Structure formats: C-alpha cells, structure tokens
C-alpha cells in the first residue's frame, strides 16, 4: 500500500492506495506549529482505527504534496517513519505526463499540479480541473497535455467566513446548499451568495476558458466543498 499525504491550508488528507484503488481516506487539522512527533501521534490515531490484528497496515512507500511549506518537513519525516523510505514529494521536476506551458513551473501550487496530472491521465482532453477548498483553483490542460495555467479565487468558505468576521451585523453561518436563490433571512442570503455565487463563478470561468481554448473541455471538480456546489451548477461536471 502507498501512503498519500496531501497537506492543505485547512486539513491534511491521508490516503492508502493499493493497485490504483483508494483503500481509505482520513483527515487531520493543519496546524503549522505541530512537530513531526505531534503529527505522528495524530497519524497513529488515524491508523489505529484501521488496523486489524491479522492484517496490519504496511506502507511500501509514500507520496506527499504540500501547499504549507512550514510543515512539509515534519510530514515527510512521518512518512519516512511509516515506510522506511524517503517520500516522493510532488514538484514539476517529477514525471507527471504534463508539459508545463507556464513561465515558472515551480510557482504552480503542488495541489494544482496533482489535480492537473490526474485529470489529464484519466479524462478526455482538453480538461479543466476545479478544486473547491480554502481557495478555488482552476487548471487548464490542453489537447496536447500542456498545462496552460489557470485561475485562483477565494474559496467558498473563506469568503463566507470573511463576511462574518469583517461585517459587524453578519453572523458566522454553517455551510449548506441553499434551496433557492432568493434568501428570506440573512443566513439564507449569505448561503445563496456564497454557494450559488461559487457555482456561477464555476460556470462563467469555464465558459471563458473554453472560448480561449477554442473548443469544449471536460470539467472535473474536486475538493472538500464540491458537494455544496455541484448540485447547483449548470455545467456538466465529472
């Protein structure tokens, strides 16, 4: 089994992958001040729930992607503890199957690189990926598997939280999918603006990208907040 570690701004995702199949996924909070030992203790909690006396979890290797440089080293040390090997850390220098068509490939977020490489290998080209997380990111891969660039926007929950923090009369709102565009109270208005606004952003940006490409593209959506946006988007999504 391969241990996959995805270090995001809000959560660290852990996954076990065997023969191309995802066996489990778990999450920990991203805490920039945690040490390797503290993260290892958190990982032990995750793995202890999945261990079976007759089938212990054994990792043959690890792959790690990170958008939080402060803790990349700590999680890489954890990966080495569980595998006995140095993890593969995602960067433009590893083989992804993509040609990087941007001036500075090393400035592309590693999470975006993983999204783009997976989509290009598994979906019809050209393909656009949308990752709905702390930030909303679009990545564009053309019909020749060239990474053309993309779009970065504030994430759905980031914008919603900012309203509650920066506007004195607006509350913090629990995220859910709105049932209508017209909100009948403050909370429903905020949900409509945030969730439907993100869906309209997705629809509109995708249309403009397709116009620039000169042809339709496959749209692949991922990320922890996708479940709120997919049901209200007008675009055909994968």
Across the structure, where does each feature detected by a protein language model lie?
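Short glycine-rich, Thr/Ser-proximal phosphate-binding strand/loop in the N-terminal lobe
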Residues: 2-42, 146-171, 177
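Phosphate-binding/catalytic loop of phosphoryl-transfer enzymes
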Residues: 85-89, 94-166, 195-206
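Polyanion-binding loop/helix "lid" in catalytic or ligand-binding cores
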Residues: 187, 193-209, 213, 228
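N-terminal phosphate-binding loop and adjacent alpha-helix
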Residues: 22-74, 157, 162, 192, ...
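Glycine-rich phosphate-binding loops at beta-strand->alpha-helix junctions
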Residues: 34, 65-72, 192, 214-233
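Short glycine-aspartate micro-motif
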Residues: 2-6, 63, 127-131, 220
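Conserved small/polar residues in nucleotide/adenosyl-binding loops
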Residues: 235-238
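A mobile "lid/hinge" subdomain adjacent to the ATP/sugar-phosphate binding pocket shared
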Residues: 164-196, 218, 225-227
């Amino acid at each position: 089994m391969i241990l996959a570690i995805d270090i995001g701004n809000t959560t660290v995702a852990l996954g076990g992958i065997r023969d191309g199949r995802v066996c489990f996924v778990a999450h920990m909070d991203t805490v920039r001040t945690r040490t390797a030992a503290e993260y290892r203790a958190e990982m032990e909690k995750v793995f202890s729930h999945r261990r079976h006396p007759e089938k212990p979890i054994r990792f043959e290797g690890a792959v790690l992607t990170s958008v939080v440089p402060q803790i990349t080293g700590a999680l890489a040390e954890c990966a080495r503890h569980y595998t006995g090997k140095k993890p593969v850390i995602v960067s433009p220098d590893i083989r992804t199957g993509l040609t990087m068509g941007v001036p500075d490939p090393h400035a592309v977020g590693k999470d975006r690189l993983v999204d783009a490489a997976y989509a290009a290998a598994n979906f019809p080209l050209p393909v656009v990926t949308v990752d709905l997380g702390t930030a909303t990111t679009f990545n564009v891969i053309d019909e020749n598997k060239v990474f053309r660039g993309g779009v970065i926007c504030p994430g759905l929950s980031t914008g919603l939280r900012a309203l509650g923090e920066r506007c004195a009369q607006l509350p913090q709102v629990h995220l859910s999918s709105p049932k209508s565009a017209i909100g009948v109270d403050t909370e429903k208005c905020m949900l409509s603006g945030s969730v439907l606004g993100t869906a309209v952003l997705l629809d509109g940006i995708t249309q403009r990208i397709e116009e620039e490409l000169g042809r339709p593209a496959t749209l692949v959506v991922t990320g922890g907040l996708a479940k709120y946006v997919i049901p209200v988007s007008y675009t055909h999504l994968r």
